[in-house]
Design a protein with these regions (language model features):
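Nucleotide and nucleotide-moiety/phosphate-recognizing core
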Residues: 1-134, 139-159, 166-180
Length: 181
């Protein structure tokens, strides 16, 4: 998309603001994972700086697992800032499904959604996966035997819609206006 995706505007607020608002409405333990310290976007949340660079979103998961240990949490939910329509019942449904599993991952329209997954904060399993060269969130989810949770969708209303380009941002803006009426 070019530029800083978290700072792109949707419905009068940044994508990051939408994600932070969604998360803080569901938990009192929310942190913001960033690649480097200079990416300070929201000083009201704890900032987690990626320890592993150049490996993508799984680095944020490692930071989240560290945060979970520090705050004595068994699970973490990692979301991307580019999914502004996450379902309100995401945490409840994934929490009900995870059981003793390593993760509960939603699926929608036949696609797994690793950036909206509830993870058991198993730092050892993640360290082992990374040491063997693993870098895929989906791959790690399969490694820890993630339970999948199917999400029903309505036409044109994928709750895991992902904004990856300017056209998707325009589509999200149209959808945002429709849903906020």
């Amino acid at each position: 998309m070019g530029g800083s995706k978290p700072l792109r505007m949707l419905g009068g607020a940044t994508l990051l603001r939408h994600a932070c608002d969604w998360a803080t409405a569901r938990s009192d333990h929310v942190a913001l994972a960033v690649r480097e310290a200079g990416q300070l976007f929201d000083e009201s949340l704890p900032l987690l700086i990626d320890r592993h660079t150049g490996i993508g979103p799984i680095s944020a998961l490692a930071s989240a697992f560290d945060f979970a240990q520090a705050t004595k949490r068994e699970h973490v939910l990692v979301i991307g800032c580019d999914q502004p329509f996450l379902p309100n019942n995401l945490v409840a449904r994934l929490s009900a499904a995870i059981g003793d599993g390593g993760a509960a991952m939603p699926t929608s329209l036949g696609r797994e959604q690793p950036l909206a997954t509830l993870w058991r904060a198993d730092r050892g399993a993640l360290a082992e996966y990374l040491a063997k060269g693993g870098q895929s969130l989906k791959g790690f989810a399969h490694r820890v035997n993630a339970v999948t949770v199917e999400w029903e969708t309505e036409p044109g209303c994928d709750p895991f819609f992902n904004i990856n380009d300017p056209m998707a941002l325009e589509e999200a803006e149209r959808r945002f206006r429709r849903t906020r009426r």
